[in-house]
Amino acid sequence: MKKIAYSLVLLFTAFAVITACSTSKNVSATNDLGRGKVTGTWTVNSITYEGIPENAVQSVFDQGPPSVFQGSTWTLTNSGKGIYALTNGTVQSIFWSLKTIAGSPEFSFKKLNDKEKAKNIESGYTMMVSNADGNNLTLKAPVQYANGNGYIVYNLAKK
């Protein structure tokens, strides 16, 4: 009887180890967007809207209307530090990251002020990455509108 119980425990343990390993492989397989496809200097060359009218959003990133980001330059380093510079001369330091949620890659950033550390900032902004091929980057910011959701779509080109 002890041999049967021991065999069952051993079989269950082996099954748990195999299942745990295969799950981690599936998670990493969906996370194929590396920092290399996002690092560099980017220019916002167009802003479009999906599911919402163009004038539905008055302010994005607590900075101004989406149109102020047209032509802006985003510099993203591999360390996660970065800046964006608007065409009106405004420059904002940020800390950015990539993560995959339910198989969908997301770009997140926190705005940094003088000598402020990203770990001390609780709020930030998250956009879905719908394209990142190393030369073009498309970020979709979700927006609640009326009884549904829409998106502000930022199309960036690498400089």
Give a label for each model feature.
Residues 1-33:
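Bacterial Sec-dependent N-terminal signal peptides
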Residues 21-95, 99-159:
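Lipid interaction determinants
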